[in-house]
């Protein structure tokens, strides 16, 4: 069974508590449960990883070489700053879809730049947790 890695960056572990007007009341555990259910239906394996530390995210990407089909990533605030994550994604050559719960282009101007987008086959922003589900369906369609 092919595996999809779902990576979440800083503060995503605080969903349900942090800025509910922006991110809603759903928790990371609920997102993972929804993705696990869909993955079972689609007959694909998902692995979840969240870190507040850029280097740990890079390590996880590098450790995934030859172990995964693709990556769904919400790099959170690292979207706008991390050339390191961009380079890690570039180095493993698997399909990547960037996901954001909020519409980063409707927020503060500094959030409008994504260093990750250039390494992704697509970006989903502003569709809440449905963005993760759409990304998983798309990733499976590429298999």
Curated annotation (Swiss-Prot):
Signal peptide range: none
Catalytic reactions on record: 3-dehydroquinate = 3-dehydroshikimate + H2O
Enzyme class: lyase
Any one biological process term the GO annotation gives: aromatic amino acid family biosynthetic process
Keyword Amino-acid biosynthesis part of the UniProt annotation: yes
Residues annotated as transmembrane: none
Matching Gene3D superfamilies: Dehydroquinase, class II
A Pfam match: DHquinase_II
Residue numbers binding substrate: 74, 80, 87, 101-102, 111
Single Gene Ontology MF annotation: 3-dehydroquinate dehydratase activity
Catalytic activity, EC: 4.2.1.10
UniProt KW keywords: Amino-acid biosynthesis, Aromatic amino acid biosynthesis, Lyase
Function: Catalyzes a trans-dehydration via an enolate intermediate.
Protein name, UniProt field: 3-dehydroquinate dehydratase
Lineage of origin: Bacteria, Pseudomonadati, Elusimicrobiota, Endomicrobiia, Endomicrobiales
Annotated gene: aroQ
């Amino acid at each position: 069974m092919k595996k999809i890695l779902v990576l979440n960056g800083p503060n995503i572990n605080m969903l349900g508590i942090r800025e509910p007007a922006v991110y809603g009341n759903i928790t990371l555990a609920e997102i993972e449960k929804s993705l696990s259910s869909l993955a079972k239906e689609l007959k694909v394996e998902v692995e979840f990883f969240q870190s507040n530390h850029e280097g740990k995210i890079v390590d996880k990407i590098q450790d995934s070489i030859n172990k995964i089909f693709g990556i769904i990533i919400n790099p959170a605030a690292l979207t706008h700053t991390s050339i390191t994550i961009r380079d890690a994604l570039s180095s493993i050559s698997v399909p990547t879809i960037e996901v954001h719960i909020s519409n980063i282009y409707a927020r503060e101007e500094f959030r409008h730049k994504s260093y990750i987008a250039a390494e992704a086959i697509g970006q989903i922003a502003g569709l809440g947790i449905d963005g993760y589900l759409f990304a998983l369906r798309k990733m499976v369609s590429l298999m």
